[in-house]
Amino acid sequence: MSELKQKQIFSEKALEKEQQSDSPELTAQKTFSEKETFVPVKIEEDRIETEQELQLEHVIRPRPGRKWLATSVFATFAGLVGWQAVDSVVTAVQTADWLALGWVGFITAVASLGLGAIGKELWKLRKLRNHFSIQEEAELLVHSDSVGKGKVFCEKVAEESGVLAENPGFDRWQNSINPAHSDAEILDMYDSMVVSQQDKLATKVVSQHATESAALVAVSPLAAADMLLVAWRNFKMIDNLSKVYGVELGYASRIKLLRAVFVNMAAAGASELAIDAGMDLMSMDLAGKVSARAGQGLGVGILTARLGLKAMALLRPLPWYPDRQVKLGTIRKAVVAKVASITMKP
């Protein structure tokens, strides 16, 4: 009979050493190649601007029309009316036809009022064309290295925009510039100190009209009436923006400006804004909680905001600076929040 083996006591440390000696590949050094390097990715919380928003920077101004044509037609019409009035008065006096003389006086007065209104519209159209010329001149100065023209140009812009000499921003700008500054630097300071104040007021106007239009369409069951009211409010918004920037508009100049705004909106792809708005709804976890009517109101509000931003770009005297440009996303968030607050189902 064989002898029994003596007992063996295994310690935990000895076992670990034995395992490490049996499998040395577990502790061997590993070298990663460049392709296997892991790069941490930073997650951005803010939504990246869409290509449609970046296209807002490009402004398409209306082409200058034939100034001589409108002036010639107006002068010819005014001359013929005056000639006819004088001839009719002379004929009525010679024939002692006092009734005809009275009618001639009445028609001449009405024609004079009409000519005055037409002349006023032509004058406002000319001022709007001059405003666009100032914008183009500002773009040239911003991208040039010239010296000596910036101060005179900005003072002219302030006069055209109705900026008073007592304006704090304008006074600060005057005390900040010196002969060593280039024209581009002077325009940059004028934009940051004077025009930026107008931009803040204009942004409030656009945001207010956009949110109100969105809420109006979202809660009202009358689609046709809503669209008429929205169209009227858009005209009102453009009028308010023109007052902020000191651009006087008449009926003809207002239509010309509105056409320019629509051209810019079409060029920027305004029809794709509903996709951006839908992404905002998803990000706010509102999908399935708002009605189709609320979606329509949201679309109207976004389009109103874009119309307002395009009007701002056409009405402000200087081109947008990238770091101070009003973004569509700022107003869009306010519109989405407004629609969500009044249409979310409990």
Swiss-Prot record:
Bilayer-spanning residue ranges: 73-93, 98-118
InterPro entries hit by this protein: DUF697 (IPR021147), UPF0283 (IPR006507)
Disulfide bonds: none
Bias kind Polar residues: ranges: 21-30
Region (Disordered) residue spans: 1-30
Cell compartments where the protein resides: Cell inner membrane
Pfam families referenced in this protein's UniProt entry, alphabetically: DUF697
Keywords: Cell inner membrane, Cell membrane, Membrane, Transmembrane, Transmembrane helix
Any one Gene Ontology cellular component term annotated for this protein: plasma membrane
Mode of membrane association: Multi-pass membrane protein
Protein family: Belongs to the UPF0283 family.
Name of the featured protein: UPF0283 membrane protein VP1870
